[in-house]
Amino acid sequence: MHQYHDLLERILSDGAEKHDRTGTGTLSVFGHQMRFNLGAGFPLVTTKRLPLKAIVHELLWFLRGDTNIKYLHDHGVTIWDEWADANGDLGPVYGYQWRSWPTPDGGHIDQIANVIDMIKRNPDSRRLIVTAWNPADVEKMALPPCHCLFQFYVVNGKLSCQLYQRSADVFLGVPFNIASYALLTMMVAQVTGLKPGEFVHSFGDVHLYSNHVEQARLQLTRAPRSLPTMTLNPDVKDIFAFRYEDFALAGYDPHPHIKAEVAV
């Protein structure tokens, strides 16, 4: 995972001091790209321990089209608690836009089902896109989408995915995002009869919060270890049929967790 360490180092050396919505302060760079060959191992950061359960359940929650944290709580995941209202609702966030994008005539578009169908029918299409950035709904969301658009690409029987992330908390959020979209790429590849190719992660404002600087410096003193492998249950052929038990991670030997506070 040298790609991630290179990004941390770039921000620490070249980042501009910027004010931000949370009032915490950041070091920020604009425009960066990382590439991960999914055939070389599952890109789960090894220089600190990450909670795979939370990553998997959050992705399954998105794919359900869910926007209430009850499902997450039922599975011991609390990463969205700070933004939910008293009823656990978040407004029309990721899951809603992915699965039920509203149309002017009162209908809804299931972008996930549509893109999978298009990959099967026309894999050379340049329109294999899902977006969560809906300007009409942004003000209704508890948190506007940070990872806001992704595109699939098929060549030589392999499926690749590129994510555009407008805003990225490099210490806490980005390791989650890498693993989540790598896993989504593997899932979509399986249900479309393809092999996983690359995950390409492109950023707009990628930043290190001022209260994460020492943690990032600590992480950079640790040597990355071999990537683990992720295996999916080969019997699952429907993207919406995956369950937590269908994922098996092997060979994950990370350095210890590094505690840091989330900026809300």
UniProtKB/Swiss-Prot annotation:
Detail which positions bind (6R)-5,10-methylene-5,6,7,8-tetrahydrofolate: D169, A263
Compartment(s) of residence: Cytoplasm
Broad class of where this protein is predominantly found? cytoplasm
Give one GO term, molecular function aspect. Answer: thymidylate synthase activity
Q: Provide one Gene Ontology cellular component.
A: cytosol
Q: Name one Pfam family in it.
A: Thymidylat_synt
Catalytic center residues: C146
List the catalysed reactions: dUMP + (6R)-5,10-methylene-5,6,7,8-tetrahydrofolate = 7,8-dihydrofolate + dTMP
Q: In which pathway does it act?
A: Pyrimidine metabolism; dTTP biosynthesis
Query: What is this enzyme's EC?
Result: 2.1.1.45
- Tell me, which GO biological process terms does this entry list? dTMP biosynthetic process; dTTP biosynthetic process; methylation
**Which parts of the sequence bind dUMP?**
R21, R126, R127, R166, S167, A168, D169, N177, H207, L208, Y209
Under InterPro entries, the record lists: Thymidate_synth/dCMP_Mease, Thymidate_synth/dCMP_Mease_dom, Thymidate_synth/dCMP_Mease_sf, Thymidylate_synthase, Thymidylate_synthase_AS
Q: Which UniProt keywords apply?
A: Cytoplasm, Methyltransferase, Nucleotide biosynthesis, Transferase
Q: Of which family is this protein a member?
A: Belongs to the thymidylate synthase family. Bacterial-type ThyA subfamily.
Its biological purpose is as follows:
Catalyzes the reductive methylation of 2'-deoxyuridine-5'-monophosphate (dUMP) to 2'-deoxythymidine-5'-monophosphate (dTMP) while utilizing 5,10-methylenetetrahydrofolate (mTHF) as the methyl donor and reductant in the reaction, yielding dihydrofolate (DHF) as a by-product. This enzymatic reaction provides an intracellular de novo source of dTMP, an essential precursor for DNA biosynthesis.
Q: Assembly state and interactors?
A: Homodimer.
- Name the chain's protein: Thymidylate synthase
Instruction: Give the classification, highest ranks.
Output: Bacteria, Pseudomonadati, Pseudomonadota, Alphaproteobacteria, Hyphomicrobiales
